């Protein structure tokens, strides 16, 4: 199974313009993401998918590969769909979609997701990762997406709200969704053609589109958290983590 990892990156962001190029310990954030991904075993290729020349120049400047996509991509998955069409991937090629705001992604987590797909081909439509929340402040923070899944690790729902809600007890694990997905080229093209989901639009979480249309998302639990960069303040958190990493 050929595995291609794509990192969608856009320059425009209402909360943090130019986020992919924000410096973290002297390197643009997108470089941290790319270099972490490059440490994962089993990947055939890694590309940044972007429509911005500044991001393109930065990635090529550190030796990375870029696919230029259209400026009208409505979501990261739409950008991925554009990129895989240009790359000419086969229908059954595995595509890893790693969000560009994950500068601390652990390569072992990427390998875990690839292994899940290789061991169970055709048993689900998408796969993703989660991690148990250890920091209570994240539980009620809408920037940290929570998820619930069944006894067979099939995703039931993703939400910015706190799920599950313990009516009589708070002594239970809460899991955070990590910004990484795996699927085949064929499924991405199917997914990208689906109309916007009602819940997807409400929560602003595109993975809900798959659940709303009856597709199965398999979940694996990682041992490694991967803090997302949503605001400039998150940069300092990443720099502190990298200092002891």
Curated annotation (Swiss-Prot):
SUPFAM superfamilies named in the record: Nucleotide-diphospho-sugar transferases (SSF53448)
Cellular component per GO, a single term: cytosol
Annotated pathway: Bacterial outer membrane biogenesis; lipopolysaccharide biosynthesis
Gene3D superfamilies: Spore Coat Polysaccharide Biosynthesis Protein SpsA, Chain A
GO terms under biological process: lipopolysaccharide biosynthetic process
EC number: 2.7.7.90
Family the UniProt entry places it in: Belongs to the KdsB family.
Function: Activates KDO8N (a required 8-carbon sugar) for incorporation into bacterial lipopolysaccharide in the Shewanella genus.
HAMAP family: KdsB
Protein name as annotated: 8-amino-3,8-dideoxy-manno-octulosonate cytidylyltransferase
Native organism taxonomy: Bacteria, Pseudomonadati, Pseudomonadota, Gammaproteobacteria, Alteromonadales
Gene, per the UniProt record: kdsB
